[in-house]
Amino acid sequence: MAWPGPLLLKDRKGRAYLVFPKEGGVFHHHKGSVPHEALLEAGPGGVVRTHLGEELSVHRPTLEEYLLHMKRSATPTYPKDASAMVTLLDLAPGMRVLEAGTGSGGLTLFLARAVGEKGLVESYEARPHHLAQAERNVRAFWQVENVRFHLGKLEEAELEEAAYDGVALDLMEPWKALEKAALALKPDRFLVAYLPNITQVLELVRAAEAHPFRLERVLEVGWREWEVRLPVAHPRFQQVGHTAFLVALRRWKAS
């Protein structure tokens, strides 16, 4: 029997569960259990029932769903921010991109899918346990070999000059990586930083003035979900609030 990658199960209340099917495995729900073999037989789009009769729908997780339910060793980059970073970086298939602050690998997956199988993501993480978890998360979801993981800091890496089409930073002190990022980034391409608080933004913008970068924009990404149950519609009571500021810098040719 061929075992697929991760599957997502949803119960009648919309609660989601990420499952990695394996031979002899069993998924346990508070309303019963179901063998992993049954999940494979149902397949994505199918339905299974636990031994107590609870109905579960079977899905192949989207990238957003996988990021929200995968194991984490660090606070994740939310999907709304990760997709916005890909847009701000203006990534396309075949490009090469640098990432610093791999964390749990969520943003890494968005970058890897954006550059495609002919592109490359070089991801740097200073903490070994974060890097190990990120590698497991990425390999489990993404079978394309277009990500290289590096243990260490970007500012200490040996990088080829003007060889990368984008730089994505998720660091507490991203200004320390600006010099190396400026060296590696192609002219007229972008560096995008993910920063939780505005004091970090001010520090980064101030530091960028000493390097060949120009500030393009600083933004927050809103995300407002609605509850629609005909004939009633209203915003959901629980909303995702502030997650981070995104800072986009453009590399220019130094005179």
UniProtKB/Swiss-Prot annotation:
Domain of life (superkingdom): Bacteria
Keyword Transmembrane helix: no
InterPro entries the UniProt entry points to: SAM-dependent_MTases_sf (IPR029063), TRM61_C (IPR049470), tRNA_MeTrfase_Gcd14 (IPR014816)
Biological process according to GO: tRNA methylation
Keywords: Methyltransferase, S-adenosyl-L-methionine, Transferase, tRNA processing
Catalysed reactions listed for this entry: adenosine(58) in tRNA + S-adenosyl-L-methionine = N(1)-methyladenosine(58) in tRNA + S-adenosyl-L-homocysteine + H(+)
Subunit comment: Homotetramer composed of a dimer of dimers.
Protein name in the entry: tRNA (adenine(58)-N(1))-methyltransferase TrmI
Organism: Thermus thermophilus (strain ATCC 27634 / DSM 579 / HB8)
